Amino acid sequence: MKPPSIFNLFKKILDINSSKSKHIKKLISSGVKIVDINSVYIEDSVEILPGSVILPSTFLLGETKIESDSVIGPNTTISNSKIGKGSKVLYSIITDSKIGNNNQIGPFTYVRESTFTDSNVQLGNFVEVKTSNIGKESKSKHLAYIGDVKLENNVNIGAGTVVANFDGKTKHETSIKENVFIGSNSTIISPVIINSNSVVGAGSVVTKNVLSKETVVGNPARKLRK
């Protein structure tokens, strides 16, 4: 049996949407802008507030709620999640999570189950987040894995950073306090606490707690001597 062609998939979406046109028309009449109703799939259970824009090839599933003035898509799937006011989600997947106000998600971000972000968070290309809390103004813009982390406000996660949360048997949590800077290509071996206003130098491997206002570098990461 041949796999369905992209044309058949779009025909299926069109057929489904024709039966759901009442819900889509209701959304449009309420002030939601849907750029191409023939390429999106929006389940009846989805709530979208006025002022939001839904771009082509977007799938909105389950108990999803999109707050006002958000831009979703293109090529985005959101399932059982809440997207805060004024947020933008581009070429990304979000499942079972809550995104705060004025977030920028994507392109190519994967936000997995039980993730919560505060306001003004930025998660960029090829960043995966799972079961984590991300504080306001924090950012991870490139090529990172953040799993089982409590991330406080104004934290910068450099490109290539990995939080190694699984030891082969058990998942462990890491806590990163406010105003922490994590340099590129760092590895954080959970469970550790990286305290406020500290710096982890590029390429470091963190295996122990980092004190407040401390700078650590190396493998394993040690306090930088001045």
Describe each model-derived feature in a short phrase:
Residues 177, 211-212:
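Short coil/turn connectors at secondary-structure junctions
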Residues 205-207:
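Leucine-rich solenoid repeat scaffolds
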Residues 17, 21-24, 38, 54-194, ...:
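Flexible, glycine/small-residue-enriched loop-and-beta-strand segment within the central core
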Residues 1-39, 43-46, 51, 69, ...:
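Terminal amphipathic alpha-helical/low-complexity segments used for targeting or macromolecular assembly
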